[in-house]
Curated annotation (Swiss-Prot):
Binds 2 magnesium ions per monomer. Anthranilate 1 binds at G81. Catalyzes the transfer of the phosphoribosyl group of 5-phosphorylribose-1-pyrophosphate (PRPP) to anthranilate to yield N-(5'-phosphoribosyl)-anthranilate (PRA). Its EC number is 2.4.2.18. Keywords: Amino-acid biosynthesis, Aromatic amino acid biosynthesis, Glycosyltransferase, Magnesium, Metal-binding, Transferase, Tryptophan biosynthesis. Gene3D superfamilies: Nucleoside phosphorylase/phosphoribosyltransferase catalytic domain, Transferase, Pyrimidine Nucleoside Phosphorylase, Chain C. Pathway: Amino-acid biosynthesis; L-tryptophan biosynthesis; L-tryptophan from chorismate: step 2/5. This is Anthranilate phosphoribosyltransferase. It holds the Pfam family Glycos_transf_3. The gene is trpD. One of its GO terms (molecular function) is anthranilate phosphoribosyltransferase activity. Anthranilate 2 binds at R167. Mg(2+) 1 binds at S93, E231. One of its GO terms (cellular component) is cytosol.
């Protein structure tokens, strides 16, 4: 399918079929389309609303072009969001990754710099002293040795450079916000994935089912008139799509279900990377309050989908224990030290 044919179909609000989407996405990844065409196509998809088939096909191609990280572990899990929720919260999923790793999960965290938020996962980790410039082998060793590794997306999705300038200039959520969390280079089949719109909960859960995921929770936190979060929220109810044992369930949860008080969205916002890093450290130091509560919920879900807990409630308890014991704080120290020792050549790589 030519990009012009695809654009015509999108203007008519018609779906691009699987094989056609594969072809179109490969053209983008190979740099065969102009920025104008890429912009028109991803905007057209957004306006039409992306289907399960379109998203799954695009994710399949991105996975083909990604540099792989080789890790074999049933506990391997990713925790991330699509971004684009415009809520300006601190880095919740990044903080939750340290807590989940401290509870026994093997976290293959995948993310980048801020595109449509105040601080991306890469921004805050860099501010905390983590070395982002690591090879696939080094990251695999991080995951094996300390239970946590961070894959800086631009280093693993080099073909995305052809769409990067378009995405940055548009500055709005597009197909690529959805694709990032679906294209973990370590191939994590367990995942907590936050989405920026409630309609995407069911869609993305079905995409992950089609892509062969094992246990996932796709979530959208509802915050009333203030929009929503691509996280489990403490400011209202959270819509959940859970894939487990090949079956999909959709339900809602509230902070009160786990003995927590609901809180306003302002209590979990950060104005910049420095404030986000400060909040992350405070949580790992067991400072009580809404920021810690929202991390407990999201870390608990990560622990649950990783197979370390039998239920979300048990996952939250394990997350609390990981913070109280100091184990979560130690994970941050370990990642900073280990990633920088590797960079200096002080760690022998497998």
């Amino acid at each position: 399918m030519s990009p012009q044919e695809a654009l015509t179909r999108l203007i008519e609000h018609r779906e691009i079929f699987h094989d056609e989407m594969l072809s179109l996405m490969r053209q983008i990844m190979r740099g065969e389309l102009s920025p104008t065409l890429i912009s028109a196509i991803i905007t057209g998809l957004r306006v039409k609303k992306e289907t399960v088939g379109e998203i799954a096909a695009a994710a399949q191609v991105m996975r083909e072009f990604a540099a792989p990280v080789q890790v074999e572990d049933d506990r391997l899990v990713d925790t991330c969001g699509t971004g684009g929720d415009s809520a300006h919260t601190f880095n919740i999923s990044t903080t939750a990754a340290f807590v989940a790793a401290a509870a026994g999960a093997r976290v293959a965290k995948h993310g980048g710099r801020s595109v449509s938020s105040k601080s991306g996962s890469a921004d805050v980790l860099e501010a905390l002293g983590v070395n982002l410039d690591q090879t696939p082998a080094q990251i695999a060793e991080n995951i094996r040795e300390i239970g946590l590794g961070f894959m800086f997306a631009p280093n693993f999705h080099s073909a995305m450079k052809h769409a990067a300038s378009v995405r940055r200039e548009l500055g709005v959520r597009t197909l690529f916000n959805i694709l990032g969390p679906l294209t973990n280079p370590a191939g994590a089949k367990n995942q907590l994935l936050g989405v920026f719109h409630p309609d995407l909960v069911g869609i993305v859960t079905r995409v992950l089912h089609r892509l062969g995921s094992r246990h996932v929770m796709v979530v959208h936190g509802c915050t009333g008139n203030q929009g929503g979060l691509d996280e489990i929220t403490i400011a209202g109810e959270t819509l959940v799509g859970e894939l487990r044992h090949g079956q999909i369930l959709e339900y809602t949860i509230r902070p009160e279900d786990f003995g927590m008080k609901a809180a306003r969205i302002e209590t979990i916002q950060a104005h910049d990377t420095a404030q986000s890093a400060e909040m992350l450290r405070a949580i790992l130091n067991n400072q009580p309050g809404p920021p810690r509560d929202i991390v407990l919920l999201n870390a608990g879900a990560t622990i649950y989908v990783a197979g370390i807990a039998e239920s979300l409630a048990q996952g939250v308890k394990k997350a609390h224990a990981a913070i109280e014991s100091g184990a979560a704080r130690k994970k941050l120290q370990e990642l900073v030290e280990f990633s920088n020792r590797q960079n200096r050549g002080e760690v022998s790589l497998v």
